[in-house]
Each structure stands twice: as C-alpha cells, then as structure tokens.
C-alpha cells in the first residue's frame, strides 16, 4: 500500500529479496515515510499505531493530532477486538456488522473487501466463507496459544498444495507476509507462506528475477537484487585490485551499498524494467566501472609522487576501471596548477560510474554517505569523473581498449550525467598525466539528495561505449591521447558551486557522458582548458580559466573557433542547453534535468562535454567546454524543488514538454554544432557524440560572464523540450530499447494530462464559486408590491402592437424597474418578460408621488436628461440627442397616457404620461438629429400614432378592465384636445395635473397610503409651472412639457435610481 516512490535501501534488498513484514507501519511494516505517503502516528493515549496514509486510507493527514479509528471511537479497549484474528492491537477499522478488524487482515484474506476503497472502510466480512473460521492457526499452536488458534479467520499458505493455515497478524509478526506482482502491471497479490515454504521460497528468490516486495515499486526494483549482490562482490574484488595499484583506502562497505541503493532508486523512478535489463548488460559489459564508482578516494593533494602513482595506476588500470578512480582521488596540490583545489576525491572514477550511476559518492572526504546523500549526487563529482577520465583517456592510448573505452566514455558520460550539485569547489585538473590531478576533487558536498533516474542511461551508454570502442580506436588512434601527455593543458575545472543544486551538474554530466565516451582524446591536445568554474556561493560567477601549457589561454571565441578548426571539439555549451544531457544517456537525462539548475543552474558547466576532438595532438587546443557562465538566472533555472528532489519529479521535469518539439539540432547531426563552429569534418567524427547536439553556442569569449551568453531557451520548458527531442533521437540512433522511450513518453503524457486536469479543476472550482455567489444573491426574495394586480400582460402586448415607431418594449428585468425612469438600452424584452415584470410590479410604482425635489442630489441619466413625476405621472424629457437612445420606461401594470409624437422626424413619443395604474411606455428614441426636441408645439394637423393605434386596436379594449379603459379614453381625449387647439405650456400642465389628480383620488388613494407614498397634493401646481419659467434644456422654444427644468428632472432621476438601484443589482 505504500506509494510507488518508496526508495529501497540496498541493505534491505541484499539481506532479503522478499520484504518481511516487520516493524514500522502496522499494515505494510515499512518503517519509512514519504512526503506523498507519510507515516502517521496515532496520538491516542497509550496507542502505538503507526500507519502510512495510503495503507490506512487516510484521505488527508491533519496538521494537528491524528487518531486511529479505535482511539477515535473512544470505545473501551477491552471491547475492541479483531473479528479475524486474536490480536487486539494494531490498525483496526470498523466492519460492516459493527465490529472491528485489522486492515492487514482485510488485505490478506481474499474474501474480505472494503466498502470504500479510498477510505478503506468499512471492512465487509459477509463474503468470508465459514470454512475460514473453522481453520486453526498453526503458529498459535506452535507458540502454545492453543486457545486462540481457532479464533477468527485464517489465511492459508500461498504454496499450491500446502494446507497450513494461520492468522494474518501471526504471520505478520513472524515475517511471513509478502506482496507479489499480480497478473496486471498494477496488480499486487497479498499473500503469505508457512515458515517452511517461505524460507524455501526466499532462497529460490534470491537467484530469480521475480521479486516479492512489499510495494509495487519495490517489487520492480527488487528484481535487481541479485544483480546488486553480484555487483557488490565485483566491487569488492575491484576494490582489492585498486588497492594494489593505489594507496587509497578501500571504500567502506557501507559506502558501496548506499551507492547501490541510489542506483536502485534511480531506476525505480525511471523505468524499473528497462533498467534491470540494462543493469545486467552493465554488469556483463562493464564490471570494470563499478569498483571505481564506489571507491572513496581521500582527497589529499597529490605531490609529484601521487602523480606518478596515477600514471602507474592508469597503466595498470587500463583494463580495470578502478584505476580511473584512483587518479581522480588524488588532486595534485602541487604541480603546475597549484591553485587548483581538490576537495574530496571524486567517487566516480572515470569509468567507474557506469556500474551504478547512483553510486556516485559525492561526499567530500572519504566519509560514507547515507543513501540519501548518494541520491544527491553532486554534479561536480560526476563531472569530475568525466574530466579525469578524459585526462586519462588522452594520456593513455590504451584507454581505448575495451575497458578504457567503457571507462572513459561510460564513466565520463555517466558521471557527467549525474551532474552533481557540488557545494565545494571541484577542481579537476585533468592534466595530461603529468600533473594531472586527475582527481577532480569532488569536493562537492553530498549536496541535496537528488533522486535521479540516471542509471538506465548509464547502462545504455556502457553498451554504446562497447559499440564505439572499435570506432574510437580507429578514429582516435590510441597514440593520440598520449600526445596530450606533454601538454599540461589539463583543464582544471574547478567548479565550486556553492549551491549544490545549481552546480553544473547535469549538463556537463550528460554531455560528457556521450561525448567523453567517444573521445578518450578529450584532452586530446591536452587542450582541456582548465575551466575553473568558481561559482561563488551564490554560484553566479563561473569563471573559466583556460590553462594551456602550450597554448596561451584563449579568451576570445574566435580563438576557440580556431582551436575547434584545429580539431578540438568545443564541447560547447552543453551547459545550458543540456540537450546533451538527454543525449548523453537516455535515462540519465532525467537526472541531469533534475540537477538542472536549481538555484544557480547557471553553474552548469559543461565540463565533461569536451568531446573527443579529432584534432591532431599538435594543435594547442583551446577547445574545452566553455564553462557556461550562465548564472542561475540566465540559465533557465528550475526551482530546485521542481526537479531533482524527488526521483519521479526529476524524470517528469526532464520529460516535461518533450514530445512536441522538433529538436533544434538533431543529435544525428552531430557535426552540426561542431561544423557550425567551423570544426573540421573530423570534428563530426563521432556521429553519435552528443556533443554535437549541444545547442548553446557562445559567441562571446568563454570567460565572459553571464551576460555574454545568449539565452538558450526562453523558459525551462523549452529547454527540456529540446533536451527531450534530442535525447529521443539519440536513443533511437543508439538502438536503445524502445521501452525507455515509451515510458518517458507515457510519463510526459501523464504529466501533460495532469496539468490539463489541474487547470480544469481550477476552472470548475472558480465556476462553482461564481454559481454559489449567484445562488446566494438569487436566494434573497424580491420585495413584491402588488396593489392592483391587473391584466398587465394584455396591456403590454397591446402597447407593443400599437407603437409603430418602436422596435419593442424594452423592459428591465427587475420588477421594480417600474419605479425607475432609467433607460435600459440593452435589453429588448419579450412580451412575456413584460407581463411578468408588470404583474409583479405595483401599478402605482411608477406613479408614486416623488419626495420633494430638493432632497436628493442631482443625477442625470445617460439617455433621459430629466424625469419628473407629477403626482404619479411620469414625464420624461430627452436631454441629449447626440445618438439614438432607446429609453424605456419599465413596464407597469396599466397603460398610461402617451403625450405627443413629433411629426417631422418620426420620433417616438418623447414624453410619457403615466396614469395611476401604470405607464404604458413606448421607447423614446432620439433621432440622430442632435436637437430633436426643437419643435415647440405639436401642430394641430399632426397625426398621432398612438391614438390612432388605440382606436384601431379597439378590439383589445374589450380585454381591459374598466379602470384601464377609462385611462385610455382619457388619453384619447387628451390627444384630441391637443390636436384641436393650441395650448400654452401652462395650460398643458394644468390640464395634465387635473387629469392625474382626478384619477389618483378616485382609484389609488388607498394604494398610496398602503405604500406610504406622500399624498398627491403635495406638489402644488405652481411647482409644476415653475419648470416652464426656467430656461429649457435645449432651445428656448422647446416645449416645457417635454423639457422640464434640468435640476428638477435630474433630482427625480437620482431619487428613482436610488430606489431601484438595489433591485436592479439583485436581478443582474
């Protein structure tokens, strides 16, 4: 039940390939916890339950105290007992019949089920056959607990034909439970064996690939146990061999296992299957790498004596990878590069890395590190290995021989793959043999542990190396590397990156891995320049120092180019692009990416990247990798937590957008980079060399600081995409098993899908919140004022039919809009809307007598300049005619009088007089004519559409109530009056006032009182007439009835909007 991320310690694996279920989690017995699957302890008094979140079905681990179900129930301990076994302690959960049962009992008895698989409760016992309850536990019998032997239900030995039965918890305490891989990839079979068959099975399992493991992830990684054991033996043998050649202390045994562990972890994170296969190959092909990897070299500055030792060891060690580690181990403190500092010997000797990439021991000093430390390989260590390796390779022609080839290429590539974040400065001066402080000091501290999946890549590389050995020898005659001897140009790489993560790690590693393999001659002209990447603790500064014994340090890129022409590959710029990382080794890629910058990824130096140069030894080759001086910032950095802290995450990061992008530069096109640099055709010589894939080109002098380096990728995603695509092609070229590619692809797809789902969840969550908010708003009841429910819908329909000049009645959705005169420009509303709003509105809402004008601040509506209510009659005047505005008076329950239409420009009725029952409004549309209201009076002969339509649709009148019919009749009379005689503005208003007052008194006095609206008589006629004396809004000749004094009108509008604002907001 433990998450598949679980790391497996080597010691555990070696001691027992099948995990016995003892100690730790009450369910799975594992004592470790992970961030994604923590081990949770019950805080109940006297309770010792400890369970993994996944093992106990804890949906979310609380931040405070956590209690198991038993403690949570507060039931007396005496009453809580498992129905499947005699034991009372442990992780219990409720059963469907109200009892209790252990989670582990439920897992191992096949017929028991969980009602809810995610919470793992309740435990369903109804399907358990009665026969299980009749069995007796042979373990209880053996231990003298005969009384309890028949208690509960027993499981049986998983061995076919064996009839032994025992309680699950008894078997757990005896260590007889295990998990086997089921038929499907994701299936786990929980089973147990009697002691006899378990011990027998255990012996057979040690030699077999099939792994019995506690967890799925472990099961896959366990398949490699036998390999690890063999490797361990090999390591020991090699270590002995090393001792002969070297005075270095033998690596402590603890170191070896921990290293191995690392490897395993890495594998598990990447792809267990492919890895195990590759491990086999590695063992077969390159046992030589292994001991070097494990050996810890104490870093003592080497005097000339050490150097000589180194040479001797190289000569002897050609055939055994061990020698490489020895070289690295000693850093010549003296010698020509006295300045170089060596911190610990790099754990990986050049070739050594291949055996177990994980095994890199980055610890500075000889101390053994815990598996976690190993997990975090320090990039510098790896890098160092690759460098020293390169030194050796150049120094010894023999290196090319099978071993050396594997060492050089494999080790370098691997070590580089691992790129270590090294905390301490690593100075690797692979001088040609002479001073070669071959040991790159991996002074790098163990640095944060990266769990990387690099191993598979390493294995692949070792295989590749074998393939290439022949090529290398032919291409780079073994003699060439020797040529380098003379020159001390050993590059002295001092990479001190204060931030472990930032240090150059993966880029160089991956690059070198492939490139080094190919070119033992990396140092070929001795030209390795010593890049000293001294990254200050900040890691921002990476200074490259080129030391060429023969050649003067080249500071300019042109010189580098020349050197390249001479045949030296500039391992260009791996650092940033890391495409090589991928290319270096398929699986290693993830690792390198994880290293990738975490804080100052800028440090990545592409040290190992020097690819074998095809150059003649004579040329003073400057071409060494230019340390990519990118500071963390220029290099697209991924926060450290993003990559590398978890094994899976490193893979994922690597994979990250891989698939879609075309590789900018195909690996296949190895020569591409080199050629671009003007390298001689020979430069492209190792077609596979990942160096070619390096994408970053530094046009600036290598020493230049970050600003000179062109940013390679705008974002880490682009960088990773490039890496991925190039690595993919590289793997294809190498004939790497497709399963690695397939797994990487599937991981990438899963990651993309996961991101998509996360986005979807975010969007849905936001949508849900919006809907909840809207629901809350809508749940507030609308205050409905229904004084005179009248068949308003009929009237609205009628009005819609009768207003020929209007498109449709616009009614605002709020039922109270009747109160407001505010224009609603946007919503043409269906008649149904009108009816519904009209019915729910009080017929008098629009007609209510307004409070005194002075009480509210002036406010002007956009479409209606002024609105004046006179004892419930609303008069609207259009203030501005700049653009056609449809101002709608919200539907009210009864049809009011409509005053006048201006004949000339088909203006819809400008003013609306609402009878007390309500206002039937027609939109007041302004023509484009800026002063549409300039017509002072309505000519007597003007035809008024409204009265005509009213008479034409007289059939509709029958449907109206008496009250409404009266209103319409008054309307017609009023229109006729206007037609027959010219009225002065005062007469108009007086007439209108009387009409309204009459209706108001007759019908709506009770209504108004109910609504607590001031009486109709509060507004004296003088106030009404005052508007005519004030200057009109438009022209002096404007009809005062149509244009009411601006102040009065705006104040009314303000009041109306104040009343209806909240309602409108609620509705919207």
Swiss-Prot record:
PROSITE patterns the UniProt entry points to: EPHD, ZF_PHD_1, ZF_PHD_2
Chain intervals annotated as zinc finger (PHD-type): 22-74, 135-198
GO molecular function (one): DNA binding
Cross-link type Glycyl lysine isopeptide (Lys-Gly) (interchain with G-Cter in SUMO2), residue numbers: 280
Acetylation listed as a keyword: no
Leucine-zipper: annotated span: 750-778
Region (Interaction with FSTL3): 141-233
Compositionally biased residues, Low complexity: 211-222, 352-372, 490-505, 583-594, 674-694, 834-848, 855-865
Start-end of C2HC pre-PHD-type zinc fingers: 79-112
Stated name of the protein: Protein AF-10
């Amino acid at each position: 039940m433990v998450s598949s991320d679980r790391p497996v310690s080597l010691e555990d694996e070696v001691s027992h390939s099948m995990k016995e279920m003892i100690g730790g989690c009450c369910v799975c017995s594992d004592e470790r916890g992970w961030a994604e699957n923590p081990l949770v302890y019950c805080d109940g008094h006297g309770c010792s339950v400890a369970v993994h979140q996944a093992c106990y079905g804890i949906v979310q681990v609380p931040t405070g105290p956590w209690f198991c179900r038993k403690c949570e129930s507060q039931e007396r301990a005496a009453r809580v007992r498992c129905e499947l076994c005699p034991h009372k302690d442990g992780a219990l959960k409720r059963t469907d019949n109200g009892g209790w049962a252990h989670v582990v009992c439920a897992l191992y008895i096949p017929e028991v089920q969980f009602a809810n698989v995610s919470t793992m409760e309740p435990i369903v016992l109804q399907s358990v056959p009665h026969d299980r309850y009749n069995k007796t536990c042979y373990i209880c019998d053996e231990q003298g607990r005969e009384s309890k032997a028949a208690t509960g239900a027993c499981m049986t030995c998983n061995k076919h034909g064996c009839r032994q039965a025992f309680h699950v918890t008894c078997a757990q305490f005896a260590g007889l439970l295990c998990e086997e891989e089921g038929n499907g990839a994701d299936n786990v079979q929980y089973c147990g064996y009697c002691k006899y068959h378990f011990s027998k099975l255990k012996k057979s399992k040690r030699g077999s690939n099939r792994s019995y493991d506690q967890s799925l992830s472990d099961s896959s990684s366990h398949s490699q146990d036998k390999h690890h054991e063999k490797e361990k033996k090999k390591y020991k043998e090699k270590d002995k061999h090393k001792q002969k050649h070297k005075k270095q202390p033998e690596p402590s045994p603890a170191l070896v296992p921990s290293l191995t562990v690392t490897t395993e972890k890495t594998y598990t994170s990447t792809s267990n299957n492919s890895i195990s296969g590759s491990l086999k190959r590695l063992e077969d092909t390159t046992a030589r790498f292994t001991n070097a990897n494990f050996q810890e070299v104490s870093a003592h500055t080497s005097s000339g004596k050490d150097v000589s030792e180194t040479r001797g060891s190289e000569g002897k060690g050609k055939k055994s990878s061990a020698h490489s580690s020895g070289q690295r181990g000693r850093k010549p403190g003296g010698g020509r590069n006295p300045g170089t500092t060596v911190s610990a010997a790099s754990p990986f000797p050049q070739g050594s890395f291949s055996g177990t990439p994980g095994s890199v021991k980055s610890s500075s000093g000889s101390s053994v590190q815990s598996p976690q430390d190993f997990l975090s390989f320090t990039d510098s260590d790896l890098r160092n290995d690759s460098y020293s390796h390169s030194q050796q390779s150049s120094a010894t022609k023999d290196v090319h021989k099978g071993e050396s080839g594997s060492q050089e290429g494999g080790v370098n590539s691997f070590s580089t793959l691992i790129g270590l974040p090294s905390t301490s400065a690593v100075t690797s001066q692979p001088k040609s043999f002479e001073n070669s402080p071959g040991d790159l000091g991996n002074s790098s501290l163990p640095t944060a542990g990266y769990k990387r999946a690099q191993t598979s890549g390493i294995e692949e590389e070792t295989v590749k190396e074998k393939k290439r050995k022949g090529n290398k020898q032919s291409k780079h005659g073994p003699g060439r590397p020797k040529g380098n001897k003379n020159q001390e140009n050993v590059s002295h790489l001092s990479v001190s990156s204060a931030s472990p993560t930032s240090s150059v790690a993966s880029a160089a590693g991956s690059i070198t891995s492939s490139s080094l393999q190919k070119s033992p001659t990396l140092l070929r002209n001795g030209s390795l320049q010593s890049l000293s990447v001294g990254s200050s603790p900040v890691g921002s500064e990476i200074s490259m120092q080129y030391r060429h014994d023969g050649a003067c340090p080249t500071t300019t890129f042109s010189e580098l180019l020349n050197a390249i022409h001479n045949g030296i590959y500039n391992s260009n710029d791996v650092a940033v692009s890391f495409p090589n990382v991928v290319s270096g080794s398929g699986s290693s890629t993830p690792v390198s990416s994880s290293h990738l910058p975490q804080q100052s990824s800028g440090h990545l130096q592409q040290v190992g990247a020097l690819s074998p140069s095809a150059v003649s030894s004579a040329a003073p080759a400057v071409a060494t990798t230019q340390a990519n001086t990118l500071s963390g910032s220029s290099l697209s950095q991924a926060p450290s937590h993003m990559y590398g802290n978890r094994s899976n995450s490193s893979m994922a990061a690597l994979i990250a957008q891989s698939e879609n992008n075309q590789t900018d530069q195909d690996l296949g096109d190895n020569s591409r980079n080199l050629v671009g640099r003007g390298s001689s055709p020979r430069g492209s010589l190792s077609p596979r060399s990942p160096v070619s894939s390096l994408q970053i080109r530094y046009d600036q002098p290598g020493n230049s600081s970050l600003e000179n380096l062109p940013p390679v990728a705008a974002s880490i995603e682009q960088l990773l995409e490039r890496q991925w695509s190039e690595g993919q092609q590289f793997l294809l070229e190498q004939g790497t098993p497709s399963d690695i590619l397939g797994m990487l692809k599937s991981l990438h797809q899963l990651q993309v899908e996961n991101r998509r789902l996360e986005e979807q969840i975010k969007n849905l969550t936001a949508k849900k919140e919006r809907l909840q908010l809207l629901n809350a708003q809508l749940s507030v009841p609308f205050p409905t004022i229904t004084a005179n429910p009248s068949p308003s819908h009929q009237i609205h329909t009628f009005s819609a039919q009768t207003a020929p000049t209007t498109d449709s009645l616009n009614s605002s959705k709020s039922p109270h809009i009747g109160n407001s005169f505010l224009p609603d420009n946007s919503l043409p509303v269906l008649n149904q809307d009108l009816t519904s709003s009209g019915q729910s509105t009080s017929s008098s809402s629009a007609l209510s007598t307004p409070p005194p004008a002075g009480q509210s601040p002036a406010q002007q509506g956009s479409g209606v300049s002024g609105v004046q209510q006179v004892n419930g009659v609303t008069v609207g005047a259009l203030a501005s005619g700049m653009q056609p505005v449809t101002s709608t008076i919200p539907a009210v329950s009864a049809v009011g009088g409509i005053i006048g239409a201006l004949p000339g420009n088909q203006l819809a009725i400008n003013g609306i007089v609402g009878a007390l029952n309500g206002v039937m409004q027609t939109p007041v549309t302004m023509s484009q004519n800026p002063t549409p209201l300039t017509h002072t009076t309505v000519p007597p002969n003007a035809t008024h559409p409204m009265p005509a339509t009213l008479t034409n649709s007289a059939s509709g009148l029958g449907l109206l109530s008496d009250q409404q019919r009266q209103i319409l009749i008054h309307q017609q009379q009023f229109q006729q009056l206007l037609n027959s005689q010219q009225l002065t503005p005062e007469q108009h208003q007086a007439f209108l006032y009387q009409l309204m007052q009459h209706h108001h008194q007759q019908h709506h006095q009770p209504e108004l009182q109910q609504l607590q609206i001031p009486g109709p008589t509060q507004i004296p006629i003088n106030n009404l007439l005052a508007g005519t004396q004030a200057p009109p809004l438009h022209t002096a000749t404007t009809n005062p009835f149509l244009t009411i004094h601006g102040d009065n009108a705006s104040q009314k509008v303000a009041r109306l909007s104040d009343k209806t604002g909240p309602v409108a907001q609620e509705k919207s």
